[in-house]
Amino acid sequence: MSEQNTPNGTADLFKKAWRGFQGAKWTDEVNVREFIQNNYTQYDGNEDFLAAPTEATDKLWGRLQELQKEERKKGGVLECETEVVSSLTSYGPGYIDESLKELETIVGLQTDKPLKRAFMPYGGIKMAEEAAETYGYKVNEKFHKIFTEYHKTHNQAVFDAYTPEMKAARHCHIVTGLPDTYGRGRIVGDYRRVALYGIDFLIEEKKKDLDLCGNGAMYDEIIRQREEIAEQIRALKGMKEMAKIYGYDISGPATNAKEAIQWLYFGYLAAVKTQNGAAMSVGRISTFIDIYVNRDLEEGTLTESQAQELIDHMTMKFRMVKFARIPSYNQLFSGDPVWATLEVAGLGQDGRHMVTKTDFRFLHTLENMGPSPEPNLTVLYSSRLPENFKKYAAKISVDTSSIQYENDDVMRPIWGDDYSICCCVSATQTGKEMQFFGARANLAKCLLYAINGGTDEPYMTKDGKPMQVGPEYAPITSEYLDYNEVMHKYDLMMDWLAGIYVNILNLIQYMHDKYYYEAAEMALIDTDVRRTFATGIAGFSHVVDSLSAIKYAKVKVVRDENGMASSFITEGDFPRYGNDDDRADDIAVWLLKTFLKKVKKYHTYRNSEATTSILTITSNVVYGKATGALPDGRAAFTPFAPGATPSYGAEQSGLLASLNSVAKLPYEYALDGISNTETIAPGALGHSEDERKNNLVHVLDGYFDQGAHHLNVNVFGLDKLKDAMEHPEKPEYANFTIRVSGYAVKFIDLTREQQLDVIARTCHEAM
């Protein structure tokens, strides 16, 4: 680093911090990718080097598990804050246990106590109050006055601006799960920057950006950007003060592995202290951390046991992140997820694999401390990854059902080799981009609107008539559905849905920027940021199968007293998505492409790039409860299949045929992600550990080599699920983790309704 670029003349500190590191470009500008590419060490070996948990890890994890049991006994929340608004510096230091604090190698809690939920009213005071009251806590009444009379919240602003049509669409769940009652999340700060450069350098870089912003010309875009940069600088200064509370000075760069992990974690802690976004991803940190660990190992200042302890303790902190949520949120996103998504592996653009020993160490946390939903461990997969790593990851999947896989070979050409997963399955260039999260549009209900002329079957007006939510097009009145007529009307109704959906999201994102801006996260992202506009699809497989039924069989309409199509009788057989049958799978591809094209016709906020996803989280239950019967045979008000997963029971040709169908969906039309969740009986993979992990590797290689995007892998039988549902008190189920649509969850933390939904899903007994 040149002397003039060094803040406060601290060249010696940077020299010490960067000793032995290679490369030049990253030393004069913020460029973490360049640093990684010049300094990481590939690892081709197996897991034999890994260390068992230390005594400190066992004691801390044991205490944390006791707290988690207390939390479960109290209905899912151990304690809620009622007197302090969460901020970077609103609390003194907090530890897992005051008597054990000397054992914590990585420190920092969201509040002053472990698992205590912060009070975060900026997204909506009513939501913050309701979240506390749900668990028996009462927020100090002064805050209601402050955040209704003196400080407007995001939620109030959105509902002030909603049109009656938007409110009706939201009420009837044709668009649903919207981030208007919770933080939008999905913004990943490049937390590595805190460790590599220190806060002072980052502040100086942001000050340069502020000086260059606008050149004296003041108009809306420039004014807003100047204000946002100023907020980012303020947030960076706040991070320094937050770290001081724990006795650390993060003004300069980290000088060893322990500091690098601690500095990085402070950056993430700043995010979760100030935002309660639906997804608060950690990002792609493993390779970065490995560089520091390797240097310390080579210098003899760190042992493998100590290195694993640092990773275990950091992971323990990610497992502790909690937010106070309202009941309607928990119905959408069940099981208390945070989406602290953390990626391992992948390939570089130069063809080198990026597997390091620390990738193994992060996966090993699931052995040292048992299965856990958080962090949301994600393997960036390619068949070209080292065989030893693929087999170890497969072993962890078979043993824990806690990790997911995403296809690095389809993401890398678009996002480069330094992207993070910003929620469940969505990629974003680390430190270069941010995403406007937009939940999902209910394309299954949209199909019913096309048949019923825009009226909603479950939702009635005050006089008992079906609500007119969509355009008042002529309904289909024939006894049997005609494929061409249905497709024409469905095309028109999707036009309307795409338009209102995008406009609702434009409004929400505008208000979130205005009233609940993510300054701490955006401070760790380039000022000249690229923005994506993430839409989503719910009910995907049911629409595909319904259109297939109309095209290839005969579908008779059963109408109620209002003339609404309330159920359907299908005569004859039809191809179903999930069986590697192009007749159905081609409809799936058409549906995805068509919806994205319609979304892209509309203006998106801040000139963001529109994308879409096929992803539902556990909200497939909520969406299904709001949607009537469909021509594919799905009964009214029952759960949808999640994400891009084929409908329950539709897969009749085994696991591989199901995977082949999903693999046909083109990722370039769903850059926000295509989520596929499969459950495999252990015996279907083999009769020994070696057979199972080797066969799973073959499945993953074949699936992803076809261009598929994502796979959740569960390896267990239905009997285990049923027993866990009936006997959640059994010790073996305390940390029983399963993969659902895009994330993992402790099975016993799901509602019974959602547990039954998981049990109803296809469990493949054969390949």
Descriptions of predicted regions:
Residues 2-767:
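Conserved catalytic cores of very large enzyme subunits
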